[in-house]
Amino acid sequence: MEKSQHTLFRPCIDIHQGQVKQIVGGTLGNDADVKTNYVSLKPSSYYAELYKLNHLEGAHVIMLGPNCEEAAKTALHTWPGALQIGGGINISNAQNWLQEGASKVIVTSWLFPDAQFDLDRLKAISSKIGKDRLVVDVSCRRKDNRWFAAINKWQVMTAFELNEENLDLLSQYCSEFLIHAADVEGLCKGIDEDLVIKLGEWVKIPTTYAGGGRSIEDLDLVDKLSKGKVDLTIGSALDIFGGVLEFTRVVAWNRRFTPLPLQD
């Protein structure tokens, strides 16, 4: 289905130490220092089922460190062929995750050995699994009004700049971008508006922005700033993750632009 030119809400399931959590992204470097907004008492399958029941396509499951694989598989098995998986993905395990039921795999740090972007790695994994099954996560940090890819739990800033030329290059080998603004991720203090504007100008494939989203107004803002070309993930602000924004409201937002599928 062709992407409608409206920003949609894109859900997430973030897994840390085997549990569904919402964390402050910039604090992920050391487990002892991780700032946690929310730890769910519910299994990953609860969220996968919730997204399935509400026809929320394109959710991403992110494994934040070790001991997350079983919880990730549980989510994928709950809604096979519908959830994307990221966190530690490389050319050796990507096919396995697709076989476990992921719709697409999300690759990040593996593309940056020694913090240097490796185009040959991108070409290789794209060739192996197909660009239609590959999402590139170019999560970033801001420096002097420019944005650079950040890897290894967003702690290492690379020299790979987010700009139209580089995103055009990446888009030859993948079908989608996921972009976490690591400086504002999990803070619920608003989005990086400048980055969203730039992404709206640069991207030519489906793109999801995550970082700082906290309200329905932010969905409307991203829609306007990106001219509907960038979707928005909201995590910590949602009531299903201990926040105040009602999940039913983001579902209703999507229904305005994506009618429910016909029932059999």
Curated annotation (Swiss-Prot):
Bridged cysteine pairs (disulfide): none
Which reactions are catalysed by this chain?
1-(5-phospho-beta-D-ribosyl)-5-[(5-phospho-beta-D-ribosylamino)methylideneamino]imidazole-4-carboxamide = 5-[(5-phospho-1-deoxy-D-ribulos-1-ylimino)methylamino]-1-(5-phospho-beta-D-ribosyl)imidazole-4-carboxamide
InterPro entries registered for this protein in UniProt: Aldolase_TIM (IPR013785), His6-like_euk (IPR011858), His_biosynth (IPR006062), Isoase_HisA-like (IPR044524), RibuloseP-bd_barrel (IPR011060)
Q: Quick one: which pathway?
A: Amino-acid biosynthesis; L-histidine biosynthesis; L-histidine from 5-phospho-alpha-D-ribose 1-diphosphate: step 4/9
Q: Does the keyword Cytoplasm apply?
A: yes
Biological process (GO) annotations held by this record are: L-histidine biosynthetic process
Q: What EC number(s) does the entry state?
A: 5.3.1.16
Its EC top class is isomerase
The protein depicted here goes by the name 1-(5-phosphoribosyl)-5-[(5-phosphoribosylamino)methylideneamino] imidazole-4-carboxamide isomerase
As for subcellular location, the record says: Cytoplasm
Which Gene Ontology terms of cellular component type are present? Answer: cytoplasm; cytosol; nucleus
> Which Pfam family, just one, is annotated for this protein?
His_biosynth
Q: To which protein family does this belong? A: Belongs to the HisA/HisF family.
Which source organism?
A: Schizosaccharomyces pombe (strain 972 / ATCC 24843) (Fission yeast)
Major localisation: cytoplasm
Q: Which UniProt keywords apply?
A: Amino-acid biosynthesis, Cytoplasm, Histidine biosynthesis, Isomerase
